[in-house]
Amino acid sequence: MGVIARQSIKGAIANYIGVAIGFYVSFFILTRYLTQEEIGLTRVMVDAAVLFSSLASLGSNASIVRFFPWFRDGGRHHGIFGWSLLLPLAGFSLFALIFLIFKAPLLEAYSVNAPLLADYFHLVPMLTFFALYVTVFETNASVLMRITVPKLVREVGIRLFNLAAYLLYGYRLISLDLFVCLFCGSYALAMLLNLFYLLKINRFDFSIFRIDRRFLTRDRVREVLRYTLFMTAAVLAGNIPLFNSLFLGAKAGLALTGVYTIASYVANVVEVPYRSLGAISRPVIAAAVKEERWDEVSRLARQVSLHQLLVSLLIFTLIWINIDALFTVIPNGADYAAGGVVVFVLGLAKVVNSSLSIATDVLNYSRLYSRSLLFIALLTAAAIGFNQLLIPRMGIGGAAAATLCAYGLYFALLLAYLHLRLRVSIFSAAQLKVLTLIALMLLLGEAWSRWLTPLLGLHVLLDAALKTLLLAALALWGVYSWRISQSVNDLLKKFVRAQ
């Protein structure tokens, strides 16, 4: 647990540095120098690449986490890293073939409302390859408990590389064509940096491709292959929000997708802690599931879920009470203010996913992992159906609502299934305390905006800062005095003693 805590903290620091950079870039660079259509273009390209790379991985990223404890023997890993490199390559080759076959109908779907995307659609396979191996190398580092540097590359490095491309294009030093190439190249650079890091810590050499047959009995090979194939579908669960921008681009055009993009950047801040803690907690959950210690699995799952709920809801609340101030200060904010509803609804969806996704990990690492296909099929069908239904009626708000509805249906059924079959539950009384505290904060935030803001007459930024500080202090007091989390209380006590 000490390693988990240290790596979690370092990963969180990397995440929040990335969030700070991403916040500045998204709200003060993109909105100033790129049109809504150009913002939508970059978003659709990245979301398409991430979705396609998730499928092309053929479940290898999840399988290395699940089966790493089986292959680990002291400092040796008996070829599992070679498996994790070769399987995605096979998956990408299959994806490239399918892309060539269906390229024409895909282009036709975007030709009316998003003609700019058609000009750069040929770069999507290349971007998919880069995104695929950024994740592959990061997963390899994760199971070795060396996640900090890959997190820095993903959360900070890519954003800085993109910032350079935005500024070069914003000052018209490069053409749009070169800008898009540099934008894609940032993922290539991130992929190479992650590879060099693994080489530096002496985890990669040609011996990784020699799989020790003593560790691959016929039954185990069958289990690994079956699990990997099932996880090819299961990875869709984490990428449901990507459907939103893809559907919006085709049905509403890149300009509205650009507005949705800026709003979703705000909502994405909610799940930053999930990315860090999730990457470190999954190997621990996998080890407990492997030994079928279900009481321990429930304890770990409750702990992870509680802290994810607490942190994600606190971040969501502090964002929402300042949403009007945010759209007031960003360049061309009036053009993007319509995205406020997206921030609220998609933010709630991020809270649901962050706090409950540990249930997906438990199912995927258990002997019942094949059942995940049914749940993923349900989630995918729900996401597509809700997008088709709600986007024509509600626009960008419909895209956000589609994600929330799909997640709500998915997790309700999944949690019931885990409780019935494995007796695993992630709920605790402390979560009710969190919800009560957040409701109180939202009420006080609304009261402040209605009565104190006009009364005080402060500058919008000063008013937002004062409101945030006071409500954050109230939240800390509530967490401590209500004893929501013993771990958080211990951290607060240590912080007070250190002062």
Where are these regions (language model features)?
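Interhelical loop/hinge segments that connect adjacent transmembrane helices in multipass membrane
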Residues: 1-4, 116, 172, 176-182, ...
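Helix-loop junctions and terminal segments of transmembrane helices
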Residues: 27, 57-73, 143, 263-305, ...
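Membrane-proximal transmembrane or re-entrant/amphipathic helices at the cytosolic face
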Residues: 446-499
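Interfacial segments at transmembrane-helix termini and the short loops linking adjacent helices
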Residues: 36, 103-124, 320-350, 357
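Signature of the first transmembrane helix
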Residues: 3-62, 91-100, 127, 226-249, ...
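Hydrophobic alpha-helical transmembrane segments
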Residues: 152-204, 264, 377-384, 388, ...
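Membrane-interface junctions at transmembrane-helix termini in multi-pass inner-membrane proteins
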Residues: 5, 130-156, 347-378, 418-420
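Transmembrane helical elements of multi-pass membrane transporters/channels
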Residues: 7-23, 158, 182-198, 202, ...
